[in-house]
C-alpha cells in the first residue's frame, strides 16, 4: 500500500486548462525519463511540485497542461513570478529547462529579480508561464 494518496493519472484535457482533480500530481506518472533538465536529486515518487502552503500557488496540473500542450522536451520555460517554484518542478518532470525569478526567492534555484527587468537575453525562452499575484 502506498504511503501517500494515489493521484489520478495525468492526461491532457480537451476543453480546459483549469480542470484539475488535485493541487498536485504524482510525478511518477509524468512522461519522460530523467534528464539533465531535472534538478540534482530528482526522482519520481511521492513529492509535490512547489509548496502547497505557499499563498497563491498555481496548481501543478494547470502548469503541466500548458507545458504539455505548448512546449517540447528540451525547451526553456521561464516563470518571472516563480513563487514556490511549481513551474520549475513541473518543467523538470517534463524534461524542460526551467528558469525561475521572483522578488523574494523561496529556494536556491529561483533567482531574485523584478519581472519587469529579467537578467535574460532576448529570445532565450520557448515559453513563459506567469500567474501574477
Outline where the language-model segments fall.
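Class I S-adenosyl-L-methionine-dependent methyltransferase catalytic core
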Residues: 1-133
Amino acid at each position: 500500500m502506498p504511503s501517500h494518496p494515489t493521484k489520478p493519472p495525468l492526461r491532457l484535457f480537451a476543453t480546459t486548462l483549469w480542470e484539475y482533480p488535485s493541487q498536485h500530481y504524482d510525478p511518477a506518472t509524468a512522461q519522460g525519463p530523467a534528464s539533465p533538465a531535472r534538478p540534482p536529486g530528482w526522482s519520481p515518487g511521492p513529492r509535490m511540485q512547489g509548496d502547497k502552503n505557499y499563498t497563491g500557488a498555481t496548481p501543478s496540473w494547470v502548469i503541466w497542461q500548458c507545458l504539455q500542450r505548448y512546449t517540447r522536451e528540451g525547451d526553456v520555460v521561464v516563470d518571472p513570478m516563480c513563487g514556490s517554484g511549481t513551474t520549475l518542478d513541473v518543467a523538470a518532470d517534463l524534461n524542460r529547462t526551467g528558469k525561475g525569478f521572483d522578488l523574494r526567492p523561496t529556494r536556491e534555484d529561483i533567482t531574485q529579480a523584478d519581472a519587469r527587468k529579467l537578467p535574460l537575453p532576448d529570445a532565450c525562452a520557448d515559453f513563459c508561464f506567469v500567474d501574477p499575484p
